[in-house]
Curated annotation (Swiss-Prot):
The gene is SINA. It comes from the Eukaryota. It is an enzyme of class 2 (transferase). Pathway: Protein modification; protein ubiquitination. Widely expressed. Colocalizes with SmRXR1 and SmRXR2 in vitelline cells. This is E3 ubiquitin-protein ligase sina. PANTHER family: E3 UBIQUITIN-PROTEIN LIGASE SIAH2 (PTHR45877), E3 UBIQUITIN-PROTEIN LIGASE SINA-RELATED (PTHR45877:SF2). The RING-type zinc finger domain is essential for ubiquitin ligase activity. It comes from Schistosoma mansoni (Blood fluke).
């Protein structure tokens, strides 16, 4: 088979006929805290630090190519896990295409109204996954196209069973530059459309994309809608503690544990749930701690709040204040740019009492919450 790229100008095809060391799985790294609320003043709850390896249908129109106050205390209890071992804790807690001319034809809508515009994007639908085949667009000898992702897994054309040669469909590539494609999450509510060159960038940060399990370092591969995040945590990560109120104490125990460790707690206030994370990483020549707050919500909702972390004791005070991050962004994105409270092990021990580190957490609402 000749592997060289053959450039073939194809006429615009007819419309296609085809239109989810540590505790593994869910119990793994989220044995860090208990998903139970506590209203008792001064009540102590156990949180578990975890050792780990550290982890359309959419109408499309042709573009200009055409001629047209009280602190509740939550205490953490470490779960020591060696690499490779699992430990537990007694916590209750497109159809056929013609191969004709070298010219891309202008496709005109039947009329100028939006409702009657031609769904050009559907011409690019992959017959396998129904996503869009975007430039460079490859075709079989009969002119059928398939997206790059599916093509790498196929040995023959899914439409005609012919050979999948390295033939580019230049006509479709030219047409693609004149089409606005809907976001892949349009069925989830995203109304945006994009030129194919900016489609992937948007989708990587789209507010309508599925949410990952927010537990840091967890092996949990769960994906779901925002409304399903808290039920998922309640039923599958039952060891995460939830404290009520806008002003609490997050107590991390045994901060001297070796290796990478996470402490996690939930805080409920203002009708929202926030995830408090303290992560320790092994970095030469010292251990580094990262503390931050995430909102179980969208980025727009997160902008309505400010959180304050404070280490206080031994005539010292260390404070960090910022807007919480949405769980869509994740813990690691904040750590990567140090958008969190960062301190070394010497600082941690200077504020610790008997190996336990208390962090005062205050959440404030800066403007009315957006649902």
């Amino acid at each position: 088979m000749n592997n060289s790229i053959t450039e073939v100008n194809m006429s615009v095809p007819s419309r296609a006929t085809n239109s989810n060391n540590t505790i593994l799985s869910e119990e793994r790294t989220c044995h860090r805290s208990q998903m139970a609320s506590s209203d008792a003043v001064g009540r102590t709850m156990a949180l578990l630090p975890i050792n780990h390896n550290h982890a359309l249908h959419h109408g499309i129109k042709l573009m200009p190519h055409i001629n047209m106050p009280h602190r509740e205390v939550g205490a953490t209890t470490p779960l020591v896990t060696n690499s490779g071992t699992a430990s537990t804790c007694s916590m209750s807690l497109p159809g056929s295409m013609s191969s004709a001319s070298d010219t891309v034809c202008n496709i005109l809508p039947h009329n100028t109204s939006d409702s009657s515009s031609i769904d050009l994007a559907s011409l690019f639908e992959c017959p396998v996954c129904m996503d869009y085949a975007l430039p460079p667009i490859m075709q079989c000898q009969s002119g059928h196209i398939v997206c790059a992702s599916c093509r790498s897994k196929l040995s023959s054309c899914p439409t005609c069973r012919g050979n999948l040669d390295n033939i580019r469909n230049l006509a479709m590539e030219k047409l693609a530059s004149s089409v606005l494609f809907p976001c892949k999450y349009s069925t989830s509510g995203c109304p945006e459309t994009f030129h194919y060159t900016s489609k992937s960038e948007h989708e990587a940060a789209c507010e309508y994309r599925p949410y990952d399990c927010p537990c840091p370092g967890a092996s949990c591969k769960w994906l779901g809608e925002l409304e399903q995040v808290m039920p998922h945590l309640v039923h599958h990560h039952k060891s995460i503690t939830t404290l009520q109120g806008e002003d609490i104490v997050f107590l991390a125990t045994d901060i001297s544990l070796p290796g990478a460790v996470d402490w996690v707690m939930m805080q409920s206030c203002f009708g929202h749930s926030f995830m408090l994370v303290l992560e320790k990483q092994e970095r030469v020549p010292d251990q580094i701690f990262f503390a931050l707050v995430q909102l179980i919500g969208t980025r727009k909702q997160a902008d309505q709040f400010v959180y304050r972390l404070e280490l206080n004791g031994h005539r010292r005070r260390l404070t960090w204040e910022a807007c919480p991050r949405s769980i869509h962004d994740g813990v690691q994105s904040a750590i990567a740019v140090s958008d969190c409270l960062v301190f070394d092990s010497n600082t941690a021990h200077s504020f610790a009492e008997n190996g336990n580190l208390g962090i005062n957490v205050t959440i404030s609402q800066v403007s009315p919450s957006i649902s």
